[in-house]
Swiss-Prot record:
The protein's name: Probable phosphopantothenoylcysteine decarboxylase
Gene from which the chain derives: HAL3B
Organism: Arabidopsis thaliana (Mouse-ear cress)
Expression induction: By salt stress.
Tissue-wise expression: Expressed in roots, shoots, leaves, flowers, developing siliques and seeds.
Family matches, as SUPFAM superfamilies: Homo-oligomeric flavin-containing Cys decarboxylases, HFCD
Length: 201
């Protein structure tokens, strides 16, 4: 990862994104974890809004939705939201990553704000995903193929954990806890910043 000089001296800019999994009920908690350390902006897919508790989001975190993509653009020359967010962010984290959004990213689809950001992402910058889905969906052969494609893009997987799922089943597929997602990203960022300061790669 190539970090510009100013990214070493200022707060990191973290773009958090939620896709349509019931684990999106933890999205506000995730935003609070990161907002203590970094500048945070958030993106929520239409289906994730069934679970995201918007009133409990940190006051300093702006939440963008698909509607904002279109309402912010009126004519040629106006800023394009998914491009502006990609430019702004140092790191993107999709948590939770649903089976559907995983498949979209693996196939290169870009039919909402979240997937447009990923399609336009600069892969010299880190992108993390924390999947959340039913155990049989996680174990599905398509999921394995899709994860291989994400790995080839340079996307970092924060694996799901084994527990009793929202559907009542017990098994692997629950999103990693927000505290673990936060610590994983922060440790990565601080390691890269230290290497940058020391002049190593």
């Amino acid at each position: 990862m190539n970090m510009e000089v100013d990214t070493v001296t200022r707060k990191p800019r973290i773009l958090l994104a939620a896709s349509g999994s019931v684990a999106s009920i933890k999205f506000s908690n995730l935003c609070h974890c990161f907002s203590e350390w970094a500048e945070v902006k958030a993106v929520a897919s239409k289906s994730s809004l069934n679970f995201v508790d918007k009133p409990s989001l940190p006051q300093n975190v702006t939440l963008y939705t698909d509607e904002d993509e279109w309402s912010s653009w009126n004519k040629i020359g106006d800023p394009v939201l998914h491009i502006e967010l990609r430019r702004w962010a140092d790191v993107m984290i999709i948590a939770p990553l649903s089976a559907n959004t995983l498949a979209k990213i693996a196939g290169g689809l870009c039919d909402n704000l979240l997937t447009c950001i990923v399609r336009a992402w600069d892969y010299s910058k880190p992108l993390f995903v924390a999947p959340a889905m039913n155990t049989l969906m996680w174990n599905n052969p398509f999921t394995e193929r899709h994860l291989v494609l994400l790995d080839e893009l340079g996307i970092t997987l924060i694996p799901p954990i084994k527990k009793k799922l929202a559907c009542g089943d017990y098994g692997n597929g629950a999103m990693a806890e927000p505290s673990l997602i936060y610590s994983t990203v922060r440790l990565f960022w601080e390691s890269q910043a230290r290497k940058q300061r020391d002049g190593t790669s």
